[in-house]
Amino acid sequence: MRWTKQFEIDEFRPETLEPHFAWCEEHLHVSKAKDLPPSTEVFKRGVELMGWSARVVQRAAKDCVNTNACASGCPKGAKQGMTRNLIPLAEKWGVNFVTGAKVKLLIKERGRISGVLAEIQREDRTTDLVRIDAEYVFVCAGATQTPALLRRSGIRSHVGDTFQIHPMLKVAALFDEEINAQDSVMPMVQVKEFWPDISLGGSFFTVGHLAMNLSDNWLENRDLVKHYRKMATYYVAVRGTGKGTVRPARFGSDYSHLKYELSSVDVRHLSQGLARLSTLLLQSGAKSVYPCVQGLPKIETELEAVTWLDQDLPRKNLSLTTVHAFSTCPMGERADKCAADSYGRVFGFDNLYINDASMLPDSPGINPQGTIMAVARRNAHHFIAEKK
């Protein structure tokens, strides 16, 4: 409702979107895990002791067998990526995919996009520049590449100026018992007590990732790696109130330049989140907690943890990550602040649409995948109905 009011998005009520969420969940086989790994169980124990509201995360991982390869490609095919379900379904309905093609430029002609200029890589690795004509063009290159392509093509109004993320701070926790987080999927319980500003949950774990998370204070922490079986990693994620920009690189490079300015509110929420997460983990049985903050010592007592409820973490020493990016081409009827209308049509063009993470007008404060897919399907249905 906040987005509807601020950006004047048409037909954006929960009851309008619900069928699209349901369709996406059905086709991705979204469900709760049958068994919770030890890294989840200890976290859940802390949540219950703190008395906080939480939920078990549903996953698009049909028949998961805990190979812990989610981030690099499931060897069993359990993770329901696009290649497992929606691409085969699209091909069944007549969609043709041109692979090895990289769109370099949108071709503009009198208020329309007549096609794209693409670089095609042949089997012998030679490349050709080709023109592909189209009656309608949908750009779905994600929160960073969609605005880069539009700006490279001379389309700049409210494009790439409102880049947003969910800043995340990770911690490693050392327990007395063996957790063996390296042998299972990431912890699957999320604390929602402080949502939408702050979320607490579990992070992907390998020995290499553990070493990276300890590297901010490596001289003090390096011996911990040999205790990896008794360790797990968790995160604080905040909604993100800062703003950033996305710009295409110069001189023909395919890279994008990303900039995000962490706000003072972000720092405050990250600090409070660290205090709460550390307290939860200590309650759950952790001996010590190691934040990804350079110069910050390990946290061994609740008194040390709650210090950050009132104090701010040193901004320059934070090692933050994110896996959620969005809002670079916001949609809505407010042409003074949006790049596209309520259904993704780019202002100033009759036949150019965006339909990906870039169109979310603001930070959702949750994993945006479901929202992106539901809104994209809604927009596609509207396009089809409008063209009949």
In which residue ranges do the predicted regions lie?
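FAD cofactor-binding and catalytic pocket of flavoenzymes
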Residues: 156-281, 288, 313-327, 347, ...
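Rossmann-like flavin
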Residues: 1-66, 236, 261, 265
